[in-house]
């Protein structure tokens, strides 16, 4: 499932942020000192997000297993969603001696030498973890022939989906069986607009980009894509792909018809999944989400999903949640042992992600690896699954059907790798040109992508401005040159 905080962080992390050392205040975590652990090393981990209220209890339970298996203790310090990129930038540049962190701006910091090379550690301390990883994770996280990340195994492939509010579907008797694209979405938006005028038909925000079967060699702020339905040996501009332009025309029709909020290009309004203020939205769904089960559980109501892109393994899906070991860590081997354990030991991982057994959850008798959540399971009494450890050793909630489990296995087995998986664009020769393109894109991108302006008028204006500056052709040619070399070396 697309977690709004997760993806907001991922988007923000592409921007280099500068801040003073004071920005590293307000760390939240376990305050016990290394002296409390005797001579066992305390491994310090930085994690993104809000600290669970019962973090001390979660870590106490976890450390019983970690001490026995690894001979070390884990200390987790949380940095807030909005602060993480800025604070980790300061921590990294200051050379602080931490051990493990949720990766921020992974490729850039790996290239800078901020992270430890884990290639050899994977052969010994991380060998069990390595065996459990889909090979796509290694391909997508290899930088200049070396691997610096311990990825959280989850949705190595994912698709974009329309997620419909099941309460409103049932209340107004709306049939979504024919919805497969933006173009076929229009009739149901018309129905909800007429039947429930106070509901936002298509709930999108200013960071919205229409979904398609594209792979982005660089951040979405630039228009360059590999068209997975076209010539996959070429880098192209998404605004010059005919079907993408049709999506934009359709979105403009939605905007003019009032299906999209009028202030979408400027508003920070979010739409709570649990409320009935919206009819349909977009969500990223992967095999580890078991169809609509996770969305429905989080929303506390039925959510119906309709896929609009294919399940593809891309760099983006392999880098959603990476852990790294600091190059300055004095405990690299122990750190890797803990990450290995976290991703291979079900008792350890489930105790963190579900919380304390008996309070937060209980096993269902006669059903292997199935659990029922209890009253103690709340948002602030456990850690997140997507950014903690291997989702495939997590117990499965009772609301997941056997058919959903089988479907997930099938999706995972059939998911294809993007031809660009593992391609990392070296921007050293075109940094100023990329900045120039990004500045131009900021003038047009949001209005075009949200349907606010007529794409037949705005896209030619954008392309004329891009091509008049010289930077556009230089970056495109450099990217194509590097991509050609990448494809040549793959053969």
UniProtKB/Swiss-Prot annotation:
The keyword Transmembrane helix does not apply. Its main location: other. Belongs to the bacterial solute-binding protein 1 family. GO terms for biological process: carbohydrate import across plasma membrane; protein homotetramerization; protein homotrimerization. The keyword Transport applies. GO terms for molecular function: protein homodimerization activity; zinc ion binding. Zn(2+) binds at residues 212, 247, 252, 256. It is found in: Cell surface. Keywords: Metal-binding, Sugar transport, Transport, Zinc. This is Carbohydrate ABC transporter substrate-binding protein. Exists as a monomer, homodimer, homotrimer and homotetramer; oligomerization increases with higher protein concentration. This protein has potential use in the development of vaccines and antimicrobials against pneumococcus, because of its extracellular localization and the essentiality of carbohydrate import for the pneumococcal metabolism. The characterization protocol developed for this protein can be helpful in structure-based design of inhibitors for the carbohydrate-binding proteins in general. Probably part of an ABC transporter complex involved in carbohydrate transport. Disulfide bonds: none annotated. GO terms for cellular component: ATP-binding cassette (ABC) transporter complex, substrate-binding subunit-containing; external side of cell wall. It holds the Pfam family DUF3502.
């Amino acid at each position: 499932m697309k977690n709004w905080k997760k993806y907001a962080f991922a988007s923000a992390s592409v921007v280099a942020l500068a801040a003073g050392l004071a920005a590293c205040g307000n760390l939240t975590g376990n305050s016990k000192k290394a002296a409390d652990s005797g001579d066992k090393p305390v491994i310090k981990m930085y994690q993104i997000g809000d600290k669970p209220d019962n973090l001390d209890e979660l870590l106490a339970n976890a450390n019983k297993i970690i001490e026995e298996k690894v001979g070390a203790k884990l200390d987790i310090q949380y940095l807030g969603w909005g602060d993480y990129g800025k604070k980790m930038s300061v921590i990294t540049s200051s050379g602080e001696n931490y051990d493990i962190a949720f990766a921020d701006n992974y490729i850039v910091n790996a290239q800078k030498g901020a992270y430890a090379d884990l290639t050899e550690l994977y052969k010994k301390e991380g060998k069990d973890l390595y065996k459990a990883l889909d090979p796509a994770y290694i391909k997508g996280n290899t930088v200049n022939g070396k691997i610096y990340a311990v990825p959280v195994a989850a949705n190595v492939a994912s698709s974009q989906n329309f997620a419909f509010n099941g309460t409103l579907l049932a209340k107004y008797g709306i049939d979504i069986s024919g919805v497969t694209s933006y173009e076929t979405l229009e009739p149901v938006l018309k129905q909800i607009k007429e039947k429930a005028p106070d509901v936002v038909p298509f709930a999108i925000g200013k960071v919205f980009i229409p979904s398609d079967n594209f792979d982005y060699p660089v951040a979405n702020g630039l228009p360059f894509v590999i068209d997975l339905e076209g010539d996959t040996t070429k880098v192209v501009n998404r605004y010059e792909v005919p079907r993408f332009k049709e999506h934009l025309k359709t979105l403009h029709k939605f905007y003019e018809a009032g299906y999209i909020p009028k202030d979408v290009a400027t508003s920070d309004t979010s739409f709570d999944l649990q409320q009935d203020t919206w009819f349909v939205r977009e969500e990223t769904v992967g095999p580890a989400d078991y169809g609509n089960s996770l969305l429905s559980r989080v929303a506390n109501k039925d959510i119906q999903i309709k896929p609009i892109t294919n399940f593809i393994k891309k760099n983006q899906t392999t880098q959603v949640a990476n852990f790294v070991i600091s190059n300055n860590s004095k405990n690299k081997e122990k750190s890797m042992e803990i990450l290995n354990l976290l991703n291979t030991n079900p008792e350890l991982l489930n105790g963190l992600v579900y919380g304390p057994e008996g309070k937060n959850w209980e096993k269902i008798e006669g059903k292997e690896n199935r659990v029922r959540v209890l009253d103690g399971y709340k948002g602030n009494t456990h850690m997140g699954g997507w950014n903690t450890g291997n989702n495939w050793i997590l117990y499965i909630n009772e609301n997941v059907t056997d058919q959903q489990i089988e479907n997930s296995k099938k999706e995972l087995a059939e998911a294809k790798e993007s031809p660009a998986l593992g391609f990392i664009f070296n921007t050293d020769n075109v940094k100023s040109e990329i900045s120039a393109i990004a500045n131009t894109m900021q003038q047009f991108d949001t209005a075009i992508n949200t349907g606010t302006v007529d794409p037949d008028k705005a896209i030619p204006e954008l392309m004329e401005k891009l091509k008049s500056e010289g930077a556009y052709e230089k970056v495109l040619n450099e990217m194509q040159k590097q991509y050609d070399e990448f494809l040549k070396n793959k053969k």
